[in-house]
UniProtKB/Swiss-Prot annotation:
Protein's UniProt name: Large ribosomal subunit protein bL9
Signal sequence, start to end: none
Biological processes per GO annotation: translation
One annotated Gene Ontology cellular component of this protein: ribonucleoprotein complex
Classification via PANTHER family: 50S RIBOSOMAL PROTEIN L9
NCBIfam families noted in UniProt: L9 (TIGR00158)
InterPro entries the record matches: Ribosomal_bL9, Ribosomal_bL9/RNase_H1_N, Ribosomal_bL9_bac/chp, Ribosomal_bL9_C, Ribosomal_bL9_C_sf, Ribosomal_bL9_N, Ribosomal_bL9_N_sf
Pfam families per record: Ribosomal_L9_C, Ribosomal_L9_N
Family membership: Belongs to the bacterial ribosomal protein bL9 family.
Gene coding for it: rplI
Length: 148
């Protein structure tokens, strides 16, 4: 089944991409959740027009993404979390908590969906966190999870 993605789907593509997926995945998940629309010739033409406008906008956004990357690279982010014996957290650190900690540390407002975590953060310590700011720009910073 051919579909056109309307949102970024991990492992599949970016908005505007035309991809081939299995019928069940498209019909039962992507289409009802609003992640994609069914492919037609008219929809494909519309997507090419939108992509052209988006590419012009991305050139401008690339400069902003590099600026945000510069802010994040030198940032020290500390997140206070409750922990038990041995430094094991009660629960785990979420992307939303990391975004709030970056904002509290004086960093820019980030989109939690673009964070790339090294796995589930369930203990105290220092963790590398990456964020995809732009298709061509990825920033990295260290997150310190401390007893709070």
């Amino acid at each position: 089944m051919k579909i056109i993605l309307t949102q970024e789907v991990s492992g599949l593509g970016a908005p505007g991409d035309i991809v081939e997926v299995k019928n069940g995945y498209g019909r039962n998940y992507l289409l009802p959740q609003g992640f994609a629309i069914a492919w037609t010739k008219g929809a494909e033409k519309q997507v090419t027009v939108i992509k052209r406008a988006r590419s012009a906008r991305e050139i401008r956004d690339l400069g902003h993404a590099n600026e945000v990357k510069g802010q994040l690279e030198g940032l020290k982010v500390a997140l206070k979390a409750r922990a038990g014996e041995g430094g094991r957290l009660f629960g785990s650190v979420t992307a939303a908590e990391i975004v709030a900690a970056v904002k509290a540390a004086g960093g820019p407002t980030l989109d939690r969906r673009r964070l790339e975590l090294p796995g589930h953060i369930k203990s105290l310590g220092s963790y590398p966190v990456r964020i995809k700011l732009h298709p061509e720009v990825t920033a990295a910073f260290d997150l310190s999870v401390v007893q709070g």
